[in-house]
Amino acid sequence: MLVSMDFVGGPVGGVDYPRTYQEFRAWFPDDASCAAYLARLRWPDGFRCPSCDHDRAWQTSTQHWKCVSCGRKTSVTAGTIFHRTRSPLSTWFAAIWLITSQKNGASAKNLHDMLGLGSYETAWAWLHKLRRAMVRPDRELLTDVVEVDESFIGGRATGKQGGSTSKAPVMIAVENVGTEVNRKLRLGRVRLGVADAPGSKQLVDFARTTVEPGSLIRTDGARMFRVLAFEGYKHEYLSGYSAPEPGHVTLPGPHRVASLLKRWNAGTHHYRVEREHLQYYLDEFTFRFNRRRSTARGMLFYRLLQQSVNTDPHPLQELISRRPEANVDNDINLEPIPSNTYSEF
């Protein structure tokens, strides 16, 4: 069948989203409907051959097209996180719906149990593939008033006194929108990153890469931040290491975000989080936090699916081979406290 890739149906960003699981299943009942929608996301302006840029193709199977001009065969999943998957696309779509429609997301065990995946490792790998798709490399920088600070994820390791190497320093930048009439703090978007060591100059580089020049950056009194005033930023330091007021008063944004992050991570992911994969958990929190005010449940589904099409594949074996053994020193212990993640906002 000769096609020009004029796709119809399915959710359209900002226009229409599935409101319930029943609507989701009605739109995507089988692999053919899923593949057609992936093609629509991959080629929003119509099919373009990756070799010769021709705009006409023969559809040779549910997921494959053959260019009329040069004869190149193209799969709609090639180069995406679905590349060479042996699982049905409808199962992938169900996984994305499950992850995005739940307020606090899903753990690998949730995914494994609810979708009947072959193994826990498969569910774990799928989640990490999707987390890699949650952050766009070209995303906009934070603007206006931005508070920058660091916190720690983890608890005290068994048998250790004082500080613990199991705690990972996390860098936080968040837009402070102000306060409402009831004095409730209003926050904008957030950016998170894992630091190599606490209190390092890496936090200054983090501010440079996440905040738009010309914005006002608020930090603690560490001298390393003062260079920002000479690099196109307005800089205001509100506390020092011996400041009379605690950080949650002078820099309330990062402290509120850190509190929510710890509760979300502990409430949703009850297993140990490997330090080398922590950034991807932070990316998932960022994805959810920055869309927390959306009233359309399906909007997150649409955005993650859209970004999955534009994310390079990460083969299952690559993810598993890099996964550390359980109960090693690199793991981060999370206390099992209840999650009520975004209700304050």
Regions found by a protein language model. Give the residues of each.
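Residue-level recognition of single "structural anchor" positions
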Residues: 1-345
